[in-house]
Amino acid sequence: DDESIQQAWQILTNGIYNCPAGNNQQGPHESIFCGRPSLNNFQASSWSKMCNYYDPTTTAEAARLMVSVAHKYRGNNNFEYDLVDITRQAIADRARIVYNYAVADFKSFDKKNYNTHTRQFLELLIMQDKLLGTRKEFKVGNWIQQARNLGSTSEEKDLYEWNARVQITTWGNRYCADIGKLRDYAHKEWNGLLRDFYYKRWEKYWQVLQDQLDGKLPVLPVGNSSTPTADNPAMTIDWYALEEPWTLAKNTYAASAEGDCIEVAKEAITLINN
């Protein structure tokens, strides 16, 4: 038995794994990275229910404890999987906190802190992408490769790849994504998808808000609408036009693990604590 590992699991047991009775959310907490950006981002899918039933800082402490003893378990597949998965959640939870800071900065016209927090948010997203690249289970390349392997001809392979890409992003054409609100229904925190799909959305969004703060665009009233109205600055962006090119692309993603998961997890903990 390892005291640090036991403590880490106890923290998770008392926190994120301790969903209270009566909570009717549809599955686990959804990552802030994976939903279309807005000023009231809480979940990724359009209909899922979520509530803050645990302290989001506790996952970082659990990850820190795992990292502190990781050298003793190098090469242990089960430990390394858990290390990456727990650290993945810690990054997402920290990003949600930083997101709230950035939104508050925008609403108060605090450009200095807005720049700081939006930069931190994007750094966390890229760090999660790097971390998940160390495990094949968290790589979009593995998903796409499996889809292409089902095809017998080049045409079939391309079709199956398109289906694989669409399923985890827009779920179909513009109508499905925007009117049907099926976008991000099957979102994934996966290496490759994070940096090439989710990062581009958030980078664009933060820049639009930055332009508003800089007077390059009119600062629109802050509302709670998720539809294209003047009350929602996010909707000055045509999200589907930004998303569709990735679903049509044929760029190759590595399917095998890349990098040292323990060393990258250490980097992630340092970034979370900054």
State what each model feature region is.
Residues 1-274:
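Substrate-binding groove of N-acetylhexosamine-processing glycoside hydrolases
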